[in-house]
Amino acid sequence: MKTLLEVSNLTSDDIESIFNLTIQYFNNTNLNHNILTGKVIVNLFFESSTRTLSSFEIAEKSLGAHSITLNINTSSINKGESIIDTISNIDAMNPDLIIIRSQYSQFIKKISEYLPSCSIINAGDGHHEHPTQALTDYCTIRYIKKDINNLNISICGDILHSRVARSNIRLLSRYGANISLVAPPTLSCNLTGISHIYHNLIEGIRNADVIMLLRLQKERIINCVIPSEQEYSHLYMLNHEKLLHAKKDVIVMHPGPTNKGIEISNNVAEKNSVILLQVKMGVAARKAILHYLLYNKSI
């Protein structure tokens, strides 16, 4: 496997291999620091990122690769060059891998079809997919809960605009998770692989093993679909009182960035979540993915 565009690209063997590598990198941050020596990886992020870009850069450099992040603001795109031409020119320089984030759904898949010999990782495209975040979340849940099968997983928030929700649903449902969506009617959608849709947070997280919170993606909301952030937080913010309706050993997750006071209270974020563990797992997972795509040998 040389390209990762969406969760469906992954076989069960791929996922198991990436999980095993991830846990090894999670437990030993100094593992295999020269395994990608001589490899050239280019990061092209046409949309803002903190965790995904930083974790990829750390993973690349930790494994010995030459890591190049193109500054979009100073690139020739500002001189009128198209994004496709920019990527074509980067590909002509013969890097081993290009990691792309785009605000346009399915755009990265079109790039892959246009440049079939180019190895690409999708680092998030519009509201379509975010496969490396789904792998991070899969590894986090499995690390803590040991098994995905029959877990009650509630994904709460702006489902309509979330690529993280879509990738997680596609991945976790393959392993027997019972997935519920919790969102206002205007931010919900019926996706393959879910068990229930709720519009009440307490009902939606009752008996949950995992709660995955999502922020309001204001940059993608074209028309006003909620009365106000204040009303949204009153109805859908996870606080300590609402959290009591989930299982006692529930894990609270969030892919970031968090908007504390809107979808999650400060108290829950600081004391009851595994958000920072997810961030650490994200570096390990991206090391594992790079290892698997570019080296593809066991440790």
Curated annotation (Swiss-Prot):
The record's Gene Ontology cellular component field reads: cytosol
The UniProt record gives the binding positions of L-aspartate as: 79, 163, 215
Stated role = Catalyzes the condensation of carbamoyl phosphate and aspartate to form carbamoyl aspartate and inorganic phosphate, the committed step in the de novo pyrimidine nucleotide biosynthesis pathway.
The Gene Ontology biological process annotation of the record reads: 'de novo' pyrimidine nucleobase biosynthetic process; 'de novo' UMP biosynthetic process; amino acid metabolic process
Protein's gene = pyrB
Q: Family assignment? A: Belongs to the aspartate/ornithine carbamoyltransferase superfamily. ATCase family.
List the catalytic activities from the record.
Answer: carbamoyl phosphate + L-aspartate = N-carbamoyl-L-aspartate + phosphate + H(+)
Quote the protein name from its UniProt record.
Answer: Aspartate carbamoyltransferase catalytic subunit
Binding sites annotated in the UniProt record for carbamoyl phosphate: 51-52, 101, 130, 133, 256-257
Recorded superkingdom: Bacteria
Q: In which pathway does it act?
A: Pyrimidine metabolism; UMP biosynthesis via de novo pathway; (S)-dihydroorotate from bicarbonate: step 2/3
| Xref: SUPFAM superfamilies | Aspartate/ornithine carbamoyltransferase (SSF53671)
Give the matching InterPro entries.
Asp/Orn_carbamoyltranf_P-bd, Asp/Orn_carbamoylTrfase, Asp/Orn_carbamoylTrfase_sf, Asp_carbamoyltransf, Asp_carbamoyltransf_Asp/Orn-bd
Which NCBIfam families does its entry note?
Answer: asp_carb_tr (TIGR00670), PRK00856.1 (NF002032)
* UniProt KW Membrane keyword: no
Q: Which UniProt keywords apply?
A: Pyrimidine biosynthesis, Transferase
Top EC class for this record = transferase
GO MF, one annotated term: amino acid binding
Q: Which organism is it from?
A: Ehrlichia chaffeensis (strain ATCC CRL-10679 / Arkansas)
Its EC number is 2.1.3.2
Q: Which Gene3D superfamilies match?
A: Aspartate/ornithine carbamoyltransferase
What do we know about how this protein assembles, alone or with others?
Answer: Heterododecamer (2C3:3R2) of six catalytic PyrB chains organized as two trimers (C3), and six regulatory PyrI chains organized as three dimers (R2).
